[in-house]
């Protein structure tokens, strides 16, 4: 069966086509037949389209079109031109969508109906950047394939839906909870995939493991996983809470924001921009939200770049410690996403302070470009894994499982 996965974001859109057997899922993530990505630059200079198949790679700039038109042109490459992998869109049997916010109602993936679309739209007040883009992708595929092709919403918040009340209720007025103001958590598709993959690598029952998954990309979050579910996480009501990130501040004293509004006439929109787009690694270093140029600047003696990295690692260590306390112990620590998978100094810096938990790295393994591998020292009481997160495959797998229900 052919399953199309769409991951629609605010500034990019990713898509994959998988060909899966009807009888049994493969143990290892298969190579997609077709992969595509559109990036929309802030300056509006034309969308960058990249297509990859087993036999071809294709890149071009799309000029003059709307986002919906760009998306349609991306999907056309599935069944036309040199990147064609199917004869007709009717070969697609199911579509899976990443939907960022499912609120309290959606604790697992669900088939998309008019009611589900209305709920995604209504929840856009909590995710104003992402949920509208997710909904636009759903409607674009419905227009292309027709309403008879099942579409599945896989929610980023669902993995955290079993948080205990002590973890998700904020210590403000209780009435906030009635307004939907609570911790939701994000990156759930990635956290769940990495937890399940860790159990597979370790040859252990996931239900018996205490895990901390560290999703470190431009956005960063931790999850404490016990019994196969998230019981604590660092992101909150929005993806702004928690760890220091690429351009997001993570948690800061709310009194700072009150001070800036009173004493410096900061508007809500200005604070929103600063906290989400001009803070984190970029804000402290003044260089970039990407660690690679920061490492280069540190080597050249740049003190602000060094400070940015020091804060990043300090807050990562503190977050891991907090998650370990929520778990009451730790069996494995997992690093994933762009920074987690590729930045050996970050992994080393985090683990250096975790000896009291029994964490010990093997430096050679850590520096050896590990992928889906254990990089802990032989005598480490806690396993340390680097796992390549595969959210698209996780979504395709959810679609396959829906057909079996």
Curated annotation (Swiss-Prot):
Residues the entry annotates as binding substrate: 98
Top class in the EC scheme: transferase
An annotated GO cellular component: cytoplasm
Active site, UniProt feature: 156 (proton donor/acceptor)
InterPro entries documented for this protein: Ac/propionate_kinase, Aliphatic_acid_kin_short-chain, Aliphatic_acid_kinase_CS, ATPase_NBD
Enzyme Commission identifier(s): 2.7.2.1
Cofactor(s) of this protein: Mg(2+); Mn(2+)
Reactions it catalyzes: acetate + ATP = acetyl phosphate + ADP
GO molecular function, one term: acetate kinase activity
Alphabetical list of CDD domains matching this protein: ASKHA_NBD_AcK_PK (cd24010)
Positions of ATP binding: 14, 215-219, 290-292, 338-342
Cellular compartments annotated: Cytoplasm
Assigned protein family: Belongs to the acetokinase family.
Protein name, per record: Acetate kinase
Organism, as annotated: Gloeobacter violaceus (strain ATCC 29082 / PCC 7421)
Taxonomic lineage from the root: Bacteria, Bacillati, Cyanobacteriota, Cyanophyceae, Gloeobacterales
